[in-house]
Amino acid sequence: NMRDIIFTFFNYFVFFYTSMLAIFFVTFAFLSFISLKRRKDYYVESYMRKTIKESPYTPGISVIAPAFNEEKTIIDNVNSMLALEYPLFEVVIVNDGSTDSTLEKMTEYYELVEVPYAYIERIKTRPFRRLLKSSNPKYSRLIVVDKENGGTKADASNAGINVASHPYFICTDVDCILEKYALYRCISPIISSEKQVIAVSGTMLMANGCVVKDGQIIDVRTPRTPIPLFQ
């Protein structure tokens, strides 16, 4: 009868209404949790950066990047590394016997001059030719190592480690884009952990299709070509 139909319809209405309400509140709570976590991470990271920046005990970091025949992009890539945010770091570019104008371009752009240097070969590598630094104070963080080609990236990285003057180092590719605060994020678990931290690593992502300005990614976009898109 009509009364039973109305009663059944009302029960269905209450069921669907409360179900949708529950889904709404669960979704809202989940989104709120994510937002709070991001905000907490932001404030924790900001505080950590401030503490590291102002502390007189902040350890130095050497960013080591081998370069072989990188004449087309070497200046942009080195500028990207020099633009990193950290109170005490140096950029060690290892010219691994390039046969193009990689070294010449760096020499001209950064006003490099050969300087005397006590090279201690703690790790065996191919012969070390010379060490160059900029005569321009603007590029005082930059060190360029010129060596014979070692055939592997590891040989060039080891030469950079031999030259590095700071207790911590990061080995990367010269064409990799490091996030602006990457050094803060790498050193943070080392100085904040109660246990000894031997090494840390970052997340590697494809930059194909992204918009890069002044050595930093300002707009993340999906690659348009098939292979990078698949990667």
For the regions a protein language model found, what residue spans apply to each?
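N-terminal membrane-anchoring/stem segments of glycan-assembly enzymes
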Residues: 1-55
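Short, acidic, metal-binding catalytic loop of nucleotide-sugar glycosyltransferases
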Residues: 79-88, 108-116, 193
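Long helical/loop segments within the catalytic core of UDP-sugar-dependent glycosyltransferases
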Residues: 115-158, 162, 166, 180-231
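Short aromatic/hydrophobic "clamp" motif used to bind/position activated sugar donors
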Residues: 169
